[in-house]
UniProtKB/Swiss-Prot annotation:
Any one biological process term the GO annotation gives: polar nucleus fusion
Family from the record: Belongs to the NOP10 family.
Subunit structure: Component of the small nucleolar ribonucleoprotein particles containing H/ACA-type snoRNAs (H/ACA snoRNPs).
GO MF annotations, alphabetized: snoRNA binding
GO cellular component: Cajal body; mitochondrion; nucleolus; ribonucleoprotein complex
Chain's role: Required for ribosome biogenesis. Part of a complex which catalyzes pseudouridylation of rRNA. This involves the isomerization of uridine such that the ribose is subsequently attached to C5, instead of the normal N1. Pseudouridine ('psi') residues may serve to stabilize the conformation of rRNAs.
Assigned keywords, A-Z: Nucleus, Ribonucleoprotein, Ribosome biogenesis, rRNA processing
Main location: nucleus
Pfam families for this protein: Nop10p (PF04135)
Membrane-traversing stretches: none
Organism: Arabidopsis thaliana (Mouse-ear cress)
Lineage, highest ranks first: Eukaryota, Viridiplantae, Streptophyta, Embryophyta, Tracheophyta
SS bond partners: none
Protein name: H/ACA ribonucleoprotein complex subunit 3-like protein
Amino acid sequence: MYLQCYINEKGEKVYTTKKESPLGLATESAHPARFSPDDKYSKQRVLLKKRFGLLPTQNAPLQY
């Protein structure tokens, strides 16, 4: 049994072990994806973020 979660009508995250929410929708895993230091696709990910202006350095500076 793996921990699953879904978003209820109020927008709250609800944790369960069932594969389906009471509304009949599929639940998603409550655990984050594993991080691997041997990331094969990091170069492509950075290139895509640079192309679409999603890098943190391409945003306006934060106002503190």
